[in-house]
Amino acid sequence: MAKSLRSKWKRKMRAEKRKKNAPRELNRLKSILRVDGDALMKDVEEIATVVVAKPRQEKMQCEEGRCDGADEEKDDMKMETEIKRNRKTLLDQHGQYPVWMNQRQRKRLKAKREKKRGKSRAKAAKGLAW
């Protein structure tokens, strides 16, 4: 399909705007990422998710051999996220597909599974016939 003059003009203007604002944006990002500094956490939270450093420090201490009760917390965390999933079919123990899988793919895999299941049942029925 041909590109319209309007879309070409819009693209050109966006590119010029990016060129104009690039130094300002770069300075803003540098000020946010500056470790020593003046950057406010609110600015950082606008751009990225902030992770608290405490769990990482505890992990480092455990590696050095100074663990004290952190094992209990790890067990609790495992309990929350422990999902047993079949690697071949991607189904979990409740028969649910992963959240990231789209509906078409789920439907296709289900149909494939049902088709395979139907073939095996038909063969068993045929073998039982007198």
Swiss-Prot record:
It is found in: Nucleus, Nucleolus; Chromosome. Widely expressed, with high levels in testis and spleen and low levels in heart. In the brain, expressed in the cortex and hippocampus, and at very low levels in the cerebellum. It holds the Pfam family LLPH. Residues 1-23, 57-76, 104-130 are annotated as: Disordered. There is a cross-link at K78 (Glycyl lysine isopeptide (Lys-Gly) (interchain with G-Cter in SUMO2)). Residues 10-78 form a coiled coil. GO terms for cellular component: chromosome; nucleolus. Residues 1-21, 104-124 have a biased composition (Basic residues). Keywords: Chromosome, Coiled coil, Isopeptide bond, Nucleus, Ubl conjugation. One of its GO terms (molecular function) is basal RNA polymerase II transcription machinery binding. GO terms for biological process: dendrite extension; positive regulation of dendritic spine development. Disulfide bonds: none annotated. Induction: In the hippocampal neurons, down-regulated by sustained activity induced by increased extracellular potassium concentration for a prolonged time (2 - 5 hours) (at protein level). In hippocampal neurons, regulates dendritic and spine growth and synaptic transmission. Interacts with CTCF, MYO1C and with the transcriptional machinery, including RNA polymerase II and TBP. Belongs to the learning-associated protein family. This is Protein LLP homolog. It comes from Mus musculus (Mouse). The lineage of its organism: Eukaryota, Metazoa, Chordata, Craniata, Vertebrata.
